[in-house]
Amino acid sequence: MCDVVLGSQWGDEGKGKLVDILCDDIDVCARCAGGNNAGHTIVVDGKKFDFHMLPSGLVNPKCQNLVGSGVVIHVPSFFEELKNIEEKGLHCRDRLKVSSRAHLVFDFHQRTDKLKEAELSENKKSIGTTGKGIGPTYSTKASRSGIRVHHLVNSNPEAWNEFKTRYMRLVESRQKRYGEFDYDYEAELAKYEKYREELRPFVVDSVEFMHEAIAQKKKILVEGANALMLDIDFGTYPYVTSSSTGIGGVLTGLGIPPKTIRNIYGVVKAYTTRVGEGPFPTEQLNSVGETLQDVGAEYGVTTGRKRRCGWLDLVVLKYSTLINGYTSLNITKLDVLDKFKEIQVGIAYKLNGKELKSFPEDLIDLGNVEVVYKTLPGWEQDITKIKKYEDLPENAKNYLKYIEDFLGVPIQWVGTGPARDSMLEKKI
């Protein structure tokens, strides 16, 4: 059976830490969507490992790891990330697999990603993309002109010529759209001729791989990327990523049926953050937001950008819970709220004086909502040294209980600091 870890807000909730803890007792860790446009750090024996595209299960020497079909892969970044991990003493090549059906991100995807963003910026409609080429790659995938891993690694004598033909079609279509931009496609092709040999040992039929693991009753953990509010269908479109970041993306990205899913863990930051552009109803453009940013060290692992900060938004979380069906929650960074005398929580939206029954799909409406807040008392004490849930201050437990009751989902873990052991488990 499969357990799944998903982000419930706009990303950066701290999924990696929970995955790291759960990885101690699993046989397979799989990534199902996204690319190297997100990241997190795991500390093992004092060494920091930065993960962007590769599964976090690589830190467990007994765990097999899969980059699934729904992931888009920039091969140079794949090997760079692998090299950085190996240089710190983590030998994992024999435990890392790549789906033959995953699509490839090329350098020209990244160039056109930045050109597109520059165009949008001129019209003040910037998305806030990471510039990693993720959107353009999913675009070519959807238009059925993309290039998949099997196109690159196929050992048939005719395969390399077919790969070059597909590649040049993509380059030419970008040149028609953006003109002759500074890009050496011949040099990139030469690199990929070498990569095809280097990548081939990692490549598997991921459907066969996953279903063999399921049949053998292996313990499988699926590591979600980004978060529900960045989902291409259910997020704050168009300020979203280009893949399905919810539970649906797990099934389509790995080729597994719903009946194989056992637990769905929703990771929730104790307040709300967002990187880049897009609506953010509970954002605090004041000293509250600055405090959350400073105390929470809210800077992106991948981009280094400051994260926008605000109060916890239970309207967002209720919507996220409806779609993903969380079986339990991990509340992270509760300690960041330690110094607040009072803590506010968004519990409803009003538009033109009327309370909305559901999360608005239209950004004009979302930008004009009035947030209804519930004010809860803070605990005003350091909780970072606490090792048992029962020892948390009463007001901290009341804050968590309010979240549980509002969402109808039990909280199973509470993060009280950055260290791996700063995670309290609560009986459910």
Swiss-Prot record:
The enzyme's first-digit EC class, named in words, is ligase
Residues that bind Mg(2+): D12, G39
Q: In which pathway does it act?
A: Purine metabolism; AMP biosynthesis via de novo pathway; AMP from IMP: step 1/2
Keyword Metal-binding attached? yes
Q: How is the cofactor bound?
A: Binds 1 Mg(2+) ion per subunit.
GO cellular component terms given for this protein: cytoplasm
User: Which cofactor does the UniProt annotation name?
Assistant: Mg(2+)
Please give the SUPFAM superfamilies that the UniProt record associates with this protein: P-loop containing nucleoside triphosphate hydrolases
Under Gene Ontology molecular function, one entry of this record is:
adenylosuccinate synthase activity
Q: Where in the cell is it found?
A: Cytoplasm
CDD domains tied to this protein = AdSS
Instruction: Give the UniProt family note.
Output: Belongs to the adenylosuccinate synthetase family.
Protein name (Swiss-Prot/TrEMBL): Adenylosuccinate synthetase
